[in-house]
Amino acid sequence: MNGDNASSAADRAGGPAATPVPIPIGWQRCVREGAVYYISPSGTELSSLEQTRSYLLSDGTCKCGLECPLNVPKVFNFDPLAPVTPGGAGVGPASEEDMTKLCNHRRKAVAMATLYRSMETTCSHSSPGEGASPQMFHTVSPGPPSVRPPCRAPPTTPLNGGPGSIPQDPPSVPQAFPPLTGPAGLFPPPRLPDPVPSAGSSSPCFLPRGNAPSPAPPPPPAISLNAPSYNWGASLRSNLVPSDLGSPPAPHASSSPPSDSPLFHCSDALTSPPLPPSNNPPGPPGPPGPATQPPVSSATMHLPLVLGSLGGAPAVEGPGAPPFLASSLLSAAAKAQLPPPSTLQGRRPRAQAPSAAHASPRPSQRRPRRPPTVLRLLEGGGPQTPRRTRPRAPAPVPQPFPLPEPSQPILPSVLSLLGLPTPGPSHSDGSFNLLGSDAHLPPPPALSSGSPPQPRHPIQPSLPGTTSGSLSSVPGAPAPPAASKAPVVPSPVLQSPSDGLGMGAGPACPLPPLAGGEAFPFPSPEQGLALSGAGFPGMLGALPLPLSLGQPPPSPFLSHSLFGVLAGGGQPPPEPLLPPPGGPGPPSAPGEPEGPSLLVASLLSPPPSDLLPPPSAPPSNLLASFLPLLALGPTAGDGEGSAEGAGGPNGEPFSGLGDLPPLLFPPLSAPPTLIALNSALLAASLDPPSGTPPQPCVLSAPQPGPPTSSVTTATTDPGASSLGKAPSNSGRPQLLSPLLSASLLGDLSSLASSPGALPSLLQPPGPLLSSQLGLQLLPGGGAPPALSEASSPLACLLQSLQIPPEQPDAPCLPPESPASALEPEPARPPLSALAPPHASPDPPVPELLTGRGSGKRGRRGGGGLRGINGETRPGRGRKPGSRREPGRLALKWGTRGGFNGQMERSPRRTHHWQHNGELAEGGAEPKDPPLPGTHSEDLKVPPGIVRKSRRGRRRKYNPARNSSSSRQDVTLEPSPTTRAAVPLPPRARPGRPAKNKRRKLAP
């Protein structure tokens, strides 16, 4: 430690050479035919001390892992009979006692040793049952460090060659699978089996990585995992899901999706969830196989990874803790170095292989069922439906609707949400997972929160609904760990409530979680971003179920199928819509609540795919399809509204409208989906709406009138018809308004900022007028019009939805005062501010111009705004006085006038400049009173010049100075005495140049 060779050797070997010889970290020691070979991290073989010395003394050779004071004979023992201890310099407490005395080299070696040790311990804990655990550990340790793996690989072939190890692993994987199959061995083995890598034919490395990731996740849940520890987790994910999802969370889906589509991801996740009910007890026996996948899925989540892989999260977590305990240095270094290689290499290739492997096992059979996972996604809002146990039920449900394609999987989920028998299990599963078993599901939420967004994003591309489902199912496995991350999951929870509603079994439980606050949290920014690609991020987050349902691929199908289901399932009465979990049995009750959500989702979700690309057409179709649902009966709309808690004018239809809390967390009366949406929307829209938070009548939104303007019209008329009140009359946003406006607008605002498609939607609806709802998401001047009482907030919302119809806003607003509302939007500065993307630039300019032009003095105060340019102004202000200061402001504006409107100011400036000169004459306030006359003459003569020169100075410093000097000279000629005063006004305006000239002229 102190640089003493003996001490260092003792640290390494723990004693003289006779004692076990430590192998430096990253180095390998092989005995072949009685000869000892040391393999350096770079792969060089050293067979003797002389060769070793030569190697170490050579430049450009790899000396990683060697302690700083290196005693070659003690470190490199070529006695084939000498006992060997792996570990090297970093092994033993002595090596870590005096880190302050270690040189950088040794510190690195110790850090690496610590990192390896932590990885190995993690692997050992997580995969105690696997025979290959030693290799696993080695693999893991090498896996994270890009360089070391090769070094260790030689000793462990699997490690050495990722592919090679995989082949070897495959056998072990099968074993792992059997163990997984066995409920008892399911969880611990699963990690090694997490070898889902095995399915993916990933090598033990993956398994260890899976283990490692799980440990890593606990310490730095999201970040840590992502970093070094996550390297393994990432590799695991890559093995499981990465290819499809492309994000850590994908692991669940990836396990099966690599081979299959996102739908399959869902199915895989479902399959694994049922098998794993990794959530621990849920389905230990059944879930073994799935458990493996779920673990991987959980790996996706970082923490969830640990939970999922363990199936028994605790086991994984325990191991996980050690890795992080290892050392912040190691973790940091590992994160910086290891994550890229293991994540990049392991994730995609391995993800594909594992997914195939997983898919090939039971997952392949249940994949059809996975589609119900989509329901979970819808219910849980994506990542949340991680319940693997329940996923089993959903899996069966999908069977009735074995829709391989995204839309079809969504349909089954939708059907289940609607209350179809098939969805029943999935719903109960999803609702229970998402809502009902928040305690149980917390881990899933964590998954969803941690990595679900990413999974969602990847999933959405292939099958939004399915993707969500797969993610949800994946989170389920890691649910236990997710609990800590539950907050992130909240949005999933909300979504799950909707699902639960469809189920009807888990609403009560789910609702409490929602009440917890996590349930209602909108999707995390990550989730929103991930979802934004497919649809409105806010919409997705706010409307967990609808969003997942309305994901672009399935949205058209879903909307129609949902509508058909709703229509066929019987027009859901308002009550059915609200019916709590109690009504899950009757498809109509669950369906109806789902119906409104689905309708909303279809409206919003199609926008992601249809509306975003062709905003005008999709809305009409969606609305048209939506209208039937609305037509189903105002009761249905009312029921939804009540679920939303927005009775609005029609308080009666909304049983729960009275209480926002009930709306937000309706235990059973309102569908979970509605509750989730309503809670978020109501929270967002109820406050802004000022008194009529209810007005969320999504159903009422559709108007029998024109489908294109159906959004707006729907807002106005449908609200009245369905709710029995005129949303437009009340001016409050009806159910749709709160749901769509709060979630939609909020999401739209986020989309407007990020997604290109959404902006298109938002821009047209400048009239979204979130302002009514208290939402600032209005892109352009939409808010003011909507704000006008004439146009109901709902109309604004619908307009925003109608954005595609281009100018449906006017039609929508007309009922109330569309023209006026629309006009105000562009004109209103707040709107412009709210919706800078659309109209803000134009209106703001006029306002600024008018405001600035109207009061230049005010601008003085505002001069601070132009303080940048105004540095010179202060000087001017000194000489010119208050009047000149305004002039300076004007000049500055003139400088800016280029952009905003110099024309107006230029004349004013002229006046000001002349004025300044005149003031000098008459007021002489700024300068010498006696000289004002001459000044006025002089100034009058050069005022134009002065203006130009000053402008020139600002534009071009040197030319301006020259011109100013010439002016000064000219003005000075008439009266040298006046020079000081005359030059001063122009000089004051220019600033320093004037000062310099003054100095020159004064003498």
Swiss-Prot record:
Subcellular location, record wording: Nucleus; Chromosome
Upper lineage: Eukaryota, Metazoa, Chordata, Craniata, Vertebrata
Gene Ontology MF annotations: chromatin binding
SUPFAM superfamilies: DNA-binding domain
Organism: Mus musculus (Mouse)
Region (Required for interaction with ASXL1/2/3): 59-70
Biased composition (Gly residues): 636-650
The protein's name: Methyl-CpG-binding domain protein 6
Region called Disordered, residue ranges: 123-222, 241-302, 334-619, 631-659, 684-736, 753-1003
Chain intervals with Basic residues compositional bias: 947-958, 989-1003
